[in-house]
Amino acid sequence: MTNFKFSLLACSIAFALNASTAYAAQPTNQPTNQPTNQPTNQPTNQPTNQNSNVSEQLEQINVSGSSENINIKEKKVGETQISAKKLAKQQASDSRDLVRYETGITVVETGRTGASGYAVRGVDENRVGIMVDGLRQAETLSSQGFKELFEGYGNFNNTRNSIEIENVKTATITKGADSLKSGSGALGGSVIFETKDARDYLIDKDYYLSYKRGYQTMNNQNLKTLTLAGRSKKFDILVVDTKRDGHEIENYDYKIYPNKQADLRAVGPTREKADPYQITRQSTLIKLGFQPNENHRLSVALDDSTLETKGIDLSYALRPYSTAGNEKYGERIINDQSKRKNIQFSYENFSQTPFWDHIKLSYSSQKITNKARSDEYCHQSTCPGVRNPQGLHLVEKDGTYRIVDKDNNDFHYKKDDSDLWAWGKELHNSKGKKISDDVDTKGGSLDSVLINCEKLDCSKRFRIYQEYDENSSEKYTYDDREIKVETLPNGKKYGKIPLKKGEKLFSQEEARFLFPKSHGYSTDFVNDRDLNTHTQQIKLDLDKEFHLWHTQHQLKYGGLYEKTLKSMVNHQYNTAANVQWWADYFFCARQEGGNLGGEKKPRPDISVAGCANGTLLHSDIGKDTYLIPVTTKNNVLYFGDNVQLTSWLGLDLNYRYDHVKYLPSYDKNIPVPKGLITGLFKKFKSTDYVYGKKYSKPDGYTDCTYDTPCYKQNFKDNLALLLRKTDYKHHSYNLGLNLDPTDWLRVQLKYANGFRAPTSDEIYMTFKHPQFSIQPNTDLKAETSKTKEVAFTFYKNSSYITLNAFQNDYRNFIDLVEVGERPIEEDSVVRYPFHQNQNRDRARVRGIEIASRLEIGDLFEKLQGFHLGYKFTYQKGRIKDNGLHPKYKEFLKLNKDQHPEYEAIARKPQPMNALQPTTSVYNIGYDAPSQKWGVDMYITNVAAKKAKDSFNSQWTSMVERKEKQYTDITDIKASKANGKEVKDSRGLWRNNRYTVIDTIAYWKPIKNLTFTAGVYNLTNKKYLTWDSARSIRHIGTINRVKTETGKGLNRFYAPGRNYRMSVQFEF
């Protein structure tokens, strides 16, 4: 394999170095005055990007022909375009597959909630822009404080939403600062998606129909996609409906447990198999266009998708799980959803004027909801809340309901001869076995139990058990009684069986229903949390081509106004789950307040078992939030000009102005807990009595306990200080120089900048706790980046090699910093350790990239259709501070004597975990001249992540140290990771070098039918990706392994050998 790699690389370099002599007599590529994306005033039966035929062919990536043609003159530095056809050929199904064969970009892994955006040039998630049809996608709550407090416990679906791959027309990946296109957030790069349009299919016909079925073994995913496109006179329509149904991605050694019982018993961080989830995605894309003439077009689009994940968090670290015999206590059931709905209206005009050749006005409304719901309850039949060891069940026979034993027979009472101390009679089953210990023979009185007539037929009789009649005579017998039907205030029917009254005052019978000695349900502790992003945007785009003196210009300009509301809703409540028949068919009759002697009223919200103490089946503490809702308003103006000065010299001049405003608000219906805000800026006075019981207030103090006017006023004052408006202004630019000194060499230089305004949670998040508190910071600066890049491209015809060197400089990185202990009241000895988001000084990433493709048919005529490809990325980077980072101050002060080496560790530049290890991707392929079949082999080689290039953000809490715990200084031993003591800041888990081979083939037996199949990880290599390794958490309850031994790491390994196949019919 090593020899092969060097021979392929040598072949590519040899081609580049000899291009000028081998093809000196060949004609050059098309001149650069050919427009690339120029809209036209053609009717709808023409393609939208109407250029010359040659330029159109060069721009597209032809994946079914013999070559993948790329117009070198139109290729931007650090930019890659991936077409729908290429994605289909590679059988891409998600964001991971989108970048599978790209280098220098990977997805961010989060475990249960899947991928969360991309990592490019040393930054990830919110620092890499994602856009779909011109709209920025939802950002994560990126505050490190939020991640420390909430993300690691699986209570939020804090990920960036993805897009359905079947809807994608083109995906443009830009590496390096790209705020020009994406605005705030594109520090390291951007991924911009454009969805399909009816005109893509209706170039030479009036209808198109496609049905695609696919399957992949790594997650048992079934794919169904129906695509319809049609045109009738002035109207055209496109419908793409896609459904994916599968389960979790199967890690290597997925079948490690011998059976289902062993699988379900393997719980906690040491679990070696991926947690079981059922994952479905439903996506619908509809576009309707109306073009009354060649100069005007109106369109409306709907892009609606839902990604849903259901399953069990078996690896959950703090799941309330224990075993006692065969009984189980507690399971964590999850139901996550990511919903995105975008409605867009647009008007286009193709009339040529002195100011534009094409103008487009669009309005978009996009709503994104990322939901994370967890239900923690015991759902087995052996759970304490539903125990029914005698198998009691309800039957109906001859018009009478009866509660019988597991043998369908009645019970009977008799004296317990086995117990000399027994008093009275005990309940026995039909086989004479005593069952009083498992059946409630003291509760279930007829006057406390009501029958749910919505679920049982109350016109029938019910067999009850009478112990004493109304005259206090012993009976211990059955009696079939009529059910008296009454109506609840909501109109629903219920039934009751009154106790018989005796002749004496207050005398009545003792009669009851016999139920199992358990509640009949498990208490379900529900966490239902939503992260909502609602964006409205008005955008105006114009472009114009013109000649000025001897120069050619492609001018693009416009602006937009965007308003985004970001909010969180936290809903916690308890309800009944795993409900059994005696809690489902019956409910409580209870006097108000639980008092005795009064009238008992129906309480359908209380079970029979909870009747005595009034325990509610469903208790709701209401909705609240940990983040105040924030509206972001963004005003944008942009200008870009592609200038061709001469046949060999061109300029790219681009500028954008952003003005971002944050407008925080407060919703009384979904409040922030008052305790998080009181005393935040304006402290309570030293004479204010805030914490403790009202009756314990000392003399001379003011009562400021919860809900007092004093407390409310402090909350109001601090809230006003928190709701400060903030704004950010930024000038983005992208300058490029394109040189074509010969017909085989192109030199490009790029200088660009980008920015990221702080997210609302980074500015406004507040939290107070004796062990971890967060102070808001409305003075944060925007993060910035600058990219310097140079590229040399040697090319001829469809073959090329690009050598690229880059440098990215980042400033003002936002990080969570420990700002020291602060009193929560004036002159108080009670001090909380506070943290705050602050700006760090700088970071730098440098690297080189190679991208090449060789059409072997250009060298040897007999080898037409064969091609070779090679991509390579190497990058290094560090975060640097001027001086010591503030978060280490207290730690070093405590440990300077015993561990002076820690200061050197704290002061050295910090490695950037978002940098991928050195990666190479080789491609060998063949496309038959008939375009009826082809095959590609991709070889991906990833180097090991070096220890010195990784960083453990928790190292100060893992090394041997002195630690302040409240007022005491304690010696803490070093934690172990994979059997070794942690001694420095190097990452705990890293990937080894690995090589993965994928083989993909397609076959078109007839024009309308395409088969595609692939074998992935052909050699069944066991490997761990760096992005999966760095997703493993040391604290929290999800994405954990047993740090001391490394047990559970197998759960994070990539799939072994797996297969994909698809079939597509097109008409």
Curated annotation (Swiss-Prot):
Residue spans of the Sequence repeats: 26-29, 30-33, 34-37, 38-41, 42-45, 46-49
Domain TBDR beta-barrel: 204-1067
Ranges where the record places region Disordered: 26-53
Motif segment (TonB C-terminal box): 1050-1067
GO annotations of cellular component type: cell outer membrane
Compartments it resides in: Cell outer membrane
Membrane topology value: Multi-pass membrane protein
Record PROSITE patterns: TONB_DEPENDENT_REC_2, TONB_DEPENDENT_REC_3
Family from the record: Belongs to the TonB-dependent receptor family. Hemoglobin/haptoglobin binding protein subfamily.
NCBIfam families in UniProt: TonB-hemlactrns
Function of the molecule: Acts as a receptor for hemoglobin or the hemoglobin/haptoglobin complex of the human host and is required for heme uptake.
UniProt protein name: Hemoglobin and hemoglobin-haptoglobin-binding protein B
